[in-house]
């Protein structure tokens, strides 16, 4: 009986683990290398000091990087529409707490990256050190 309980516990833990690499794969978006640092003391990024504010940093990733202050931390997503060919749309725009695709007008939450389509926003890792935000993959 004890072995069965341990087996069930082990299988439960194993199944609850997720692979962020697998869930972040998207056939529409290439895997560009991202290594970006921004300082929130600079005027272009000072809005990131406040919850529910975001900025788009161009010339990184596929169509730029969206950085968003989610309150409990920062989220970073590619600004390319995740359900469209990367060459068919311009960068997404920020509308409050959502990113909106320029092609199909789909809205994606900047808290979760989820929208109403097959693929969520492509998410990047974030580290914060003082006023510097480092985004990478």
Name each model feature, range by range:
Residues 1-4:
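Positively charged n-region of N-terminal signal peptides that target proteins for export
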Residues 7-8:
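Sec-dependent N-terminal signal peptides
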Residues 13-16:
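C-terminal motif of bacterial Sec signal peptides marking the signal peptidase cleavage site
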Residues 18-19, 102:
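A sequence/structural signal for flexible, mid-protein segments enriched
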Residues 20-96, 107-110, 122-137:
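N-terminal pre-ligand scaffold of iron-sulfur
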Residues 112-119:
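Extended Gly/Ser/Thr-rich low-complexity repeat segments
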């Amino acid at each position: 009986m004890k072995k069965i309980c341990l087996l069930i516990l082990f299988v439960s833990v194993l199944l609850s683990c997720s692979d962020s690499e697998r869930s972040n794969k998207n056939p529409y978006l290439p895997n560009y290398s991202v290594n970006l640092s921004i300082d929130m003391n600079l005027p272009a990024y000072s809005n990131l000091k406040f919850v529910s504010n975001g900025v788009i940093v161009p010339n990184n990733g596929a169509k730029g990087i969206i950085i968003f202050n989610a309150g409990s931390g920062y989220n970073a997503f590619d600004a390319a529409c995740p359900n469209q060919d990367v060459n068919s749309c311009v960068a997404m725009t920020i509308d409050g707490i959502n990113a909106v695709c320029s092609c199909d007008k789909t809205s994606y939450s900047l808290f979760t990256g989820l929208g109403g389509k097959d693929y969520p926003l492509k998410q990047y890792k974030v580290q914060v050190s003082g006023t510097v935000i480092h985004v990478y993959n």
